[in-house]
């Protein structure tokens, strides 16, 4: 989740640029002898993810309370909004909760895409900070939202049940269990669903959700950059090098991906 990387630019996934300065993609220009080969991992790094919490207000105690209660979700870097609740006539149980249930569970999900970004920095930043300080902090590219949001493409539901049979994990981890395509018009996507098999199976289950945005360019989105044949097989690669003589400092290795947010689970214990 968190963009706690070694460049000290937390939350750097708001714009996709400068892969070596905004993320942990690093390595030497020249060939060196390493005990470990950092580019083997560095070629696959993104700009960093985010941890998001549902808090009543923006102060330390409220944020830490939400983290403790697990009412928290992660994103791949974009500031996507996500809610996931167990619903009933008497109460709403949020993501991160554990409860007992004696009927088929019903859920609701709402996701709203992140704001599309404008270049540069807002006027209030330039008027309150020195230019060299802005450059040092964010390379003159601040979080600078427009009035338009990225669209949510789909919502995926994952269902997990306990098992001791490791040879059939696909039966226990249904990923995805359900997929809901969205018709987002710029105001987000809301869905409801029910597990009609819960009382038949009589097995405690875990559920979590992923909200996936429409594709946008991302640093390291396709680090191998395969060339495919007509059968869809990768026949040639053009890796996104992070070091060595083939490293290109001007190449951010941008490729389209669906940025995403994924919730904390809801744990349901079957009650007879």
Q: What label would you give each PLM region?
A:
Residues 1-272:
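C-terminal functional module detector
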């Amino acid at each position: 989740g968190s963009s706690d990387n070694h460049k000290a630019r937390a939350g750097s996934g708001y714009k996709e640029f400068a892969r070596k300065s905004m993320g942990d993609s690093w390595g030497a220009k020249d060939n060196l002898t390493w005990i470990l080969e950092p580019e083997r991992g560095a070629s696959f790094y993104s700009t960093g993810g985010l941890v998001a919490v549902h808090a009543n207000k923006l102060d330390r105690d409220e944020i830490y309370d939400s983290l403790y209660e697990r009412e928290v979700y992660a994103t791949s870097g974009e500031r996507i909004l996500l809610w996931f609740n167990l619903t009933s006539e008497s109460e709403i149980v949020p993501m991160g909760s554990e409860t007992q249930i004696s009927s088929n569970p019903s859920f609701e999900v709402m996701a709203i895409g992140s704001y599309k970004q404008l270049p540069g920095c807002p006027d209030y930043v330039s008027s309150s900070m020195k230019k060299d300080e802005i450059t040092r902090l964010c390379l003159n590219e601040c979080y600078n939202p427009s009035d338009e949001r990225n669209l949510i493409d789909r919502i995926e539901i994952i269902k997990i049940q306990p098992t001791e049979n490791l040879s059939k994990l696909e039966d226990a981890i249904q990923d995805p269990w359900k997929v809901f395509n969205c018709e987002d018009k710029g105001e987000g996507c809301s869905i409801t669903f029910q597990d009609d098999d819960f009382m038949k199976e009589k097995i405690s289950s875990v559920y979590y959700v992923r909200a996936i945005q429409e594709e946008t360019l991302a640093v390291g989105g396709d680090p191998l950059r395969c060339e495919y044949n007509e059968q869809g097989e990768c026949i040639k690669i053009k890796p996104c090098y992070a070091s060595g003589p083939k490293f290109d400092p001007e190449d951010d290795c941008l490729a389209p991906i669906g940025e995403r947010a994924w919730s904390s689970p809801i744990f349901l214990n079957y009650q007879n």
